[in-house]
């Protein structure tokens, strides 16, 4: 068994080793590229303060770039007996470069190293989420504009209420995504601060240049206080998880609507046959399994913040091994949410709408408020108009005029999709992805 970075003369018990490493080796594969990026920035800083020579820096950077390429191709592995990604990268360096590879850990702890890895990974995942949310938003706005004049029933308490439209329905979910990205932008700002240099949580006697690594990695700023930097472990993940849960909640509600509207009892929308699944016994079935699975997956994702809270909420300041378990629920959650976003975008692009829903007389009562308002506009007090229309309905005398004239902002006749789109573009523009991408590209390519 390979010696651990922290082992001295006593080898750890085998069962203890298995239990404490847990799933960390598997989870750390998510972080491999980012561990290498962090090491590139760290050793560049070490050279600037005299802990590495220029020649050593160039040799180490070249080898780290080779390791990065391996990780970027998905070929990075953590060997048997190696407990984490940090140990594997250092092992690969020392195999190739000897004692020079052992110098990269000066002024650094695995505590701030994994904090950095998690932040670099998370901000990259946030960029992917923002791009996918933007793609879904564009589809929803396009469908809203396309079907803006097609009416459908609006419901309260699952009872027929007032006229709505597909323009409103598609557009509502588009605007919901704007708010979801507002929350994600706040989470990104917390994520995009540099913890490197906090070491084990109490800094270092080396004259580390933390601003230099902040700039090299394209962070907005630092987690200044070294104790707080370590306290941020778990807090950052929880904050991002709440933002992910917001997106998941929007998708879950949309999926529920789609399942319901697609059913025979509603018949408001229709999915292409190739987007549905069948039954092993009922030959007529065309099931909206994609939306059902999206609903379940997104409901699960809404539990992610609570999982992280329960793992971390009773810990004092400083590092504790409990925090390792957060990786197991946090890191894979991004793939699940991204898959849901891709599939919902795919489905909503192809969904067909029923343009004649309100021809059915069972929806006549939708127009009761329209009739009340018409009488009010003719001079009748609202309460009198409300009572008269109610009595007409009870007596079976209500004959609706199936027309609507809603003109205020955000209504059937005035969707304000241009304003909603402007809000989305503003939110997306507030992320500093260009700075992040440029910094990482410079580290990778020199």
Swiss-Prot record:
GO terms for biological process: arginine biosynthetic process via ornithine; L-arginine biosynthetic process. It comes from Parabacteroides distasonis (strain ATCC 8503 / DSM 20701 / CIP 104284 / JCM 5825 / NCTC 11152). NCBIfam families: argH (TIGR00838). Its EC number is 4.3.2.1. It catalyses: 2-(N(omega)-L-arginino)succinate = fumarate + L-arginine. It comes from the Bacteria. It is found in: Cytoplasm. It is an enzyme of class 4 (lyase). Belongs to the lyase 1 family. Argininosuccinate lyase subfamily. Pathway: Amino-acid biosynthesis; L-arginine biosynthesis; L-arginine from L-ornithine and carbamoyl phosphate: step 3/3. GO terms for cellular component: cytosol. One of its GO terms (molecular function) is argininosuccinate lyase activity. Gene3D superfamilies: Fumarase/aspartase (C-terminal domain), Fumarase/aspartase (Central domain), Fumarase/aspartase (N-terminal domain). This is Argininosuccinate lyase. SUPFAM superfamilies: L-aspartase-like (SSF48557).
């Amino acid at each position: 068994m390979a010696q651990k970075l922290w082992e001295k003369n006593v080898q750890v018990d085998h069962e203890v080793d298995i239990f404490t490493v847990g799933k960390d080796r598997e989870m750390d594969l998510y972080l491999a590229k980012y561990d290498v990026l962090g090491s590139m920035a760290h050793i560049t800083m070490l050279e600037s303060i005299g802990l590495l020579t220029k020649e050593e820096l160039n040799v180490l950077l070249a080898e780290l770039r080779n390791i990065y390429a391996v990780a970027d191709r998905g070929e990075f592995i953590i060997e048997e007996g190696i407990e984490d990604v940090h140990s594997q990268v250092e092992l690969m360096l020392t195999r190739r470069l000897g004692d020079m590879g052992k110098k990269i850990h000066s002024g650094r702890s695995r505590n701030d190293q994994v904090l950095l890895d998690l932040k670099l990974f998370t901000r990259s995942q946030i960029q992917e989420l923002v791009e996918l949310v933007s793609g879904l938003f564009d589809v929803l706005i396009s469908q809203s504009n396309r079907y803006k004049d097609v009416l459908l029933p609006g419901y309260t308490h699952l009872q027929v209420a007032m006229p709505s439209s597909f323009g409103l329905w598609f557009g509502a979910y588009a605007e919901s995504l704007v708010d979801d990205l507002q929350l994600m932008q706040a989470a990104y700002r917390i994520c995009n601060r540099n913890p490197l240099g906090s070491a084990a949580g109490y800094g270092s006697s080396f004259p580390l240049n933390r601003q230099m690594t902040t700039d090299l990695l394209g962070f907005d700023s630092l987690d200044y206080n070294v104790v707080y930097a370590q306290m941020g472990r778990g807090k950052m993940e929880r904050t991002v998880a709440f933002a992910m849960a917001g997106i998941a909640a929007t998708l879950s509600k949309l999926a529920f609507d789609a399942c319901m509207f697609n059913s025979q009892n509603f018949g408001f929308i229709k999915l292409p046959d190739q987007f549905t699944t069948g039954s092993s016994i009922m030959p007529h079935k065309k099931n909206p399994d994609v939306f059902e699975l999206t609903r379940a997956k997104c409901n699960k994702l809404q539990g992610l913040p609570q999982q992280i809270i329960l793992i971390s909420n009773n810990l004092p300041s400083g590092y504790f091994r409990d925090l390792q378990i957060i990786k197991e629920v946090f890191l894979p959650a991004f793939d699940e949410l991204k898959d849901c976003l891709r599939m919902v975008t795919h489905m909503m692009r192809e969904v067909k709408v029923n343009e004649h829903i309100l021809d059915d007389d069972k929806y006549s009562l939708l127009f009761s408020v329209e009739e009340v308002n018409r009488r009010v506009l003719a001079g009748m007090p609202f309460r009198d108009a409300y009572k008269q229309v109610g009595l007409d309905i009870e007596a079976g005398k209500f004959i609706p005029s199936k027309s609507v004239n809603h003109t205020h902002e955000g209504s059937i006749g005035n969707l304000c999709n241009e304003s909603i789109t402007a809000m989305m573009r503003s939110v997306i523009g507030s992320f500093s992805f260009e700075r992040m991408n440029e910094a990482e590209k410079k580290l990778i390519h020199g």
